[in-house]
Amino acid sequence: MSLLREAEKCLANQKTYASLNAFITPLQRAGPWRDRVRDSDTRRERGVTKSPLDGKLVAIKDNICTRDMPTTCASRILDTYTSPFNATVVESLEKSGAIIAGKTNLDEFGMGSHSMHSHFGPVKNVTESRREPISPGGSSGGSAVAVATGQCYAALGTDTGGSVRLPAAYTGTVGFKPSYGHVSRWGVVAYANSLDTVGVLGSSISTIREVYKTINHPDLHDPTNLPPATRTRLTAAVHNSSTTRSSPSPYLRIGIPTEYNIHELSPTVRTAWQRSIVHLQRMGHTILPVSLPATKHALAAYYVLAPAEASSNLARYDGVRYGTRDTDAPDDAEPGGYLYASSRGKGLGSEVKRRILLGAFSLSADAIDNYFLQAQRVRRLVQADFERVFRVKNPLLPAVDVDADVDGRDKKQIAGDNAGVDVLVVPTAPTLPPTVESLKRASTVETYMNDIFTVPASLAGLPALSVPVQMRGLSTVGDGDESKGDGADAAFGSVGIQAIGQFGDDEMVLHVGEMLEGMHG
C-alpha cells in the first residue's frame, strides 16, 4: 500500500471515530501534507527515504507546541492560542519526513488520569463490545485512542506520573516513557518540570523504536536535556554492565517488587502479571523477588510535588502574558485584581484549580516543611530504592548509603534481598479500565489511585514501558465491584504490564517489552 493510501486510511478513521473525541485539531483533508506524502512515496520507490517515519502520520498531544496548529492544552484559557514555533520533538519528526496527523485531546494541562477534564469534552475509549463506556486513561488519552483506532501511525504524549503508560494499558496500545532528560521538553507546555517527559504511543514496540530514535537527541534549548558527554557516560555504563551480565549467561535477572502485590490488585491483573512472569521464566530468565519499601509513599509524594510545580508554572496564564482575557469587569472592581482573578477563574477548569490550590498550600510558609520538603525526601528514598535494586548503577548518582534505616528495616538486609536485577516487571494499573459512570461517582482521591504503579518510575526518572499482554481466555468474572473497573473486559482482550529499567537503560526496557509483546495467554 502506498504511503498516501495509508494516510488517507488514517484520515478516514479520524472521521469514523470522531465521536471518540481523540482529536482537538484533526488533520484537514486538503492541504500541503498530501504533496509531502507523495514526495515520501517517491523517495520510498527510489530507496532513499529520510527515515522509517517518512510519510507516516504521527499525532501530537495538544500540550506540545506546533506552529501550524493551535496549542490549547485542552483549556479554555488557551483555546485561541497558536505557538509561533514548533517544539523540538515536532521539528525532529518533520525532519524525518513524518506528517503531523493533528493535535490530540487530553486532560487540561495534563492534569488527570482519565482524559475527562478537557474544555473540548472527554475522550472516549472504544466500546464496541461494552455496554458502558470505559476510561481511556489519561492524560494522554487522545493520543492512545488515536493509535488504538488507526487514526494515526503513532502519537506523542507527555508522561508526568503515568500519563502515557496508563492510557496505553487501558486502550491495548504500547506506551513508552523514556529516561528523564533523553527527549527534549523545549516547546512542551510545563506541568511539573522535574517530572514531565515526552513519551511515545504506538501499536507495536517496533513503532515505538522508530519514533524514539527520531526524538532522542541532545537539545541546547532545553536545560534539562542530557548533553552529549553525559549520554556517553550513560552508554558506557550500560555497555560495561551488559558485557558483565551477558557472561556467563545471556539470560536476564528480572525483579518482581513485593510492594506491588497489593490487596486492591484486580484478580485479572494479578493473573496477567503471574502469566507474564511464568512466560519470562520459561524463556530462561531468572525471576527474583525484590523490595522497594518507599513505594508505598510514592503516590502521596507525587501529589504534593507535581501540584507544587504546577502552581508556579501555571501562574503565567493570567490573561495578560498568556491566555484568554476576561474584560467584563463590574464598575467598582479593582482593574488588575479583577482581571487576574476573573481570567483564571473562568479560563481554568476545576481539576486544574484544585491542583493549583493544593500546590500553593504545600509551598506556603506553614506547610512547606511538613509537606513539600517531606515529599522531596520521599522522592530521594524512592530513587535510592531503585538504585539498590538494579545491577547497573546510575553513574550520575552518588553511591547509595546502605547503613541507615527505611521504615524500620535495615538497608543492608534490603540490599541483600535485592541481589541486583536488570529490569522490573509489574502491572501498569491495579485494575482494568473503570467505567466512566463509576468515575463520576468516585472521590478525587480514588481517581488518583490509578497512578499508584506508574508514579514511582516517574519520581526516579526511570524508563518505563507499558505493553498490552494478550490474554486469551482470561475471564474477569468474579473480579469484584464493577464500579471500580474490575468487572470490565480488558480493552482489546489485553492487560497492561510494565517494564521498568535503570536510568539510561532504555534499550533494556524495550527489549523486555518485546519478550512480553509476543506472549499470548
Curated annotation (Swiss-Prot):
Pfam families referenced in this protein's UniProt entry, alphabetically: Amidase (PF01425)
Quaternary state and interactors: Subunit of the heterotrimeric GatCAB amidotransferase (AdT) complex, composed of A, B and C subunits.
Bilayer-crossing regions: none
Molecular functions (GO terms): ATP binding; glutaminyl-tRNA synthase (glutamine-hydrolyzing) activity
EC number(s) reported in the record: 6.3.5.7
Enzymatic reactions: L-glutamyl-tRNA(Gln) + L-glutamine + ATP + H2O = L-glutaminyl-tRNA(Gln) + L-glutamate + ADP + phosphate + H(+)
EC top class named in words: ligase
Highest taxon, organism lineage: Eukaryota
Localisation per UniProt entry: Mitochondrion
Annotated organism of origin: Ajellomyces capsulatus (strain G186AR / H82 / ATCC MYA-2454 / RMSCC 2432) (Darling's disease fungus)
Keyword Repeat carried by entry: no
Protein name: Glutamyl-tRNA(Gln) amidotransferase subunit A, mitochondrial
Record-linked InterPro entries: Amidase, Amidase_CS, Amidase_dom, AS_sf, GatA
GO biological process, one term: mitochondrial translation
Record GO cellular component, one term: mitochondrion
Family to which the UniProt record says this protein belongs: Belongs to the amidase family. GatA subfamily.
Principal cellular location given in the protein's record: mitochondrion
Role according to the record: Allows the formation of correctly charged Gln-tRNA(Gln) through the transamidation of misacylated Glu-tRNA(Gln) in the mitochondria. The reaction takes place in the presence of glutamine and ATP through an activated gamma-phospho-Glu-tRNA(Gln).
